[in-house]
């Protein structure tokens, strides 16, 4: 694949991914698997090389008699025999071979792709395109720089492979978990982020409370946000025998839940992700429209979105599957006589804010 084609494909992919705006995470990070903090975005250049390499093992198969194989052996057989020990027969005087240094461009690209593998082809477990692609892509780092930045601010170590793996998947939609992925990468566009990282001429003060708007300030601490989280965790605690107290690690990274009940944890993740989105939406209303959204309105929107998700799941899934997921413990809903009953009350209870000092402030992150 020519370089101009790779460039145009990458441009189309990342323009779509970032909605035509500035890329806030490196392309090499986005190409990592989900469990390593990426989005598993395809690398078109490496994918083209993997498709080429798929047929190279036939060149070293003495039993293959395809015409194109004899043609390939002529142009690059001698070079391949030096790279792969078990293909020494390609050096035989019985096989015509090209001894120059400038084979046709197509075969030159194949040789470059083989060099990028850094491994003898015969040592691979199989010759599928996926196997070649995994070997061609850059190895996953131990962890991304954002992981160290978060641990320094929180003064604790975190299980990042589990955190990255739990961000996407489960019962949440990709749209709902997008904000969690941005927070984990330290790229959510709070005012402090725009001021310190993007160097924009904007105030770093929150539009609602006037304090520096860090991630924790915007999503955990600002004005009535603790009341919203108090309501959300009162709902979440119905799934667990031991009450849970919210914290930044639990809200941002879903870390700290008991590991015994996977179905309860899956529903707790949904509630947290929807709550994060509605809190951020209320923040945007205050920032751009100069309107303060009351707590009651935010909670009402969370309930509305939960009802939408429950009804959609009921219409899409079989009844046993629905009961084992959304109907777990009959906290959010239940099915009686083939009728769906959504148990999330329309009534909103005002909670005291005296017990909402659970969100510890930590400074705005700056991640390279």
Could you describe each region identified by the protein language model?
Residues 42, 196-245:
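Short Cys/His-based metal-binding microdomains
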């Amino acid at each position: 694949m020519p370089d101009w084609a790779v460039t145009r494909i990458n441009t189309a992919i990342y323009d779509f991914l970032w909605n035509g705006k500035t890329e806030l995470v490196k392309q090499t990070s986005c190409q990592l698997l989900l469990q390593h903090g990426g989005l598993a975005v395809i690398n078109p250049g490496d994918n083209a090389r993997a498709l080429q390499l798929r047929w190279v093992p036939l060149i070293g198969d003495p039993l293959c008699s395809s015409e194109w194989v004899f043609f390939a052996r002529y142009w690059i057989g001698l070079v391949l025999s030096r790279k792969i020990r078990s293909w020494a027969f390609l050096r035989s005087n019985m096989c015509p071979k090209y001894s120059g240094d400038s084979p046709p461009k197509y075969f030159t690209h194949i040789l470059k792709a083989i060099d990028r593998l850094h491994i003898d082809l015969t040592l691979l477990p199989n010759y599928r395109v996926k196997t070649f692609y995994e070997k061609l892509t850059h190895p996953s780092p131990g962890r991304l720089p954002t992981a160290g930045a978060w641990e320094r601010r929180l003064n604790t170590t975190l299980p990042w492979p589990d955190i990255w793996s739990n961000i996407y998947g489960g019962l949440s939609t990709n749209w709902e978990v997008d904000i969690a992925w941005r927070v984990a990468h330290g790229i959510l566009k709070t005012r402090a982020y725009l001021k310190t990282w993007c160097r924009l001429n904007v105030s770093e003060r929150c539009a609602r409370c006037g304090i520096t708007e860090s991630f924790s300030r915007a999503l955990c601490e600002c004005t009535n946000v603790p009341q919203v989280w108090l309501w959300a965790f009162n709902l979440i605690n119905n799934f667990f025998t031991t009450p849970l107290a919210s914290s930044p690690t639990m809200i941002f990274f879903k870390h700290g839940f008991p590991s015994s009940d996977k179905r309860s944890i899956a529903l707790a993740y949904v509630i947290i992700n929807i709550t994060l989105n509605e809190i951020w939406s209320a923040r945007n209303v205050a920032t751009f429209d100069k309107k303060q959204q009351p707590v009651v309105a935010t909670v009402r929107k969370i309930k509305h979105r939960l009802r939408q998700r429950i009804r959609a799941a009921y219409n899409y899934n079989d009844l046993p599957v629905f009961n084992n997921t959304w109907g777990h413990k009959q906290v959010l809903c239940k099915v009686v006589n083939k009728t769906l009953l959504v148990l999330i009350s329309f009534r909103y209870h005002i909670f005291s804010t005296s017990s909402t000092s659970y969100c510890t402030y930590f400074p705005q992150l700056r991640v390279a």
